Amino acid sequence: MAMALALGGGQDAERKVKVAEVALRALLCGLGALAAALVATDTQTRTFFSLQKKASYTDMKAMVFLVDAAAVAAGYSLLQLAARCCGGGAMSSGRGDGGGRGRALSWCVFSCDQALAYVLLAAVAAALQASVVAKRGQPELQWMGICALYGAFCRQAGAGLATAVVAGLAAVLLAFLSAFNLFRLYGSGGTKS
């Protein structure tokens, strides 16, 4: 209710919320796909004394988790966009039939959006931590940083991580919007017994 009042109230506020949701889902879809593609295609081969060593994102399990989470985020957002645009909006707003089915769908979307935000943020945090170790090393354990040796690999991984951070922020905003869409169904403005 407070968000609707802040947006101007009435039908105009409803339209703004729907536009914001579609925009966030489209942004998350694009950024998730871009982050997954940047990290998944990241490889670099170096030759050391006639031995070829290849750095790949699969060498760090946190990066594999990030690729998986970003790809799932992109796919889920694409499915939600299709349902939102083709299904008339009942999937997200919960107002499709005015009753229990709409609320059940809203709870499902809310739960999935929350889970997606948590998983994507966990993947980003793990990948950032692994990247710091890759960049700086861990002197206490005598681990050296590898970014001096695999510069192109680290730059592309950094671009993928930056994209994933923005995708994670979009997922958090989408989770907030999903919570708003759900809990406004239980608002005090004219609930029927």
Swiss-Prot record:
Keyword Translocase in annotation: no
Residue spans crossing the bilayer: 19-39, 62-82, 114-134, 157-177
Keyword line: Cell membrane, Membrane, Transmembrane, Transmembrane helix
Entry membrane topology: Multi-pass membrane protein
Major localization class: membrane
Subunit structure: Homodimer and heterodimers.
Protein name per the record: CASP-like protein 2U1
Biological source species: Sorghum bicolor
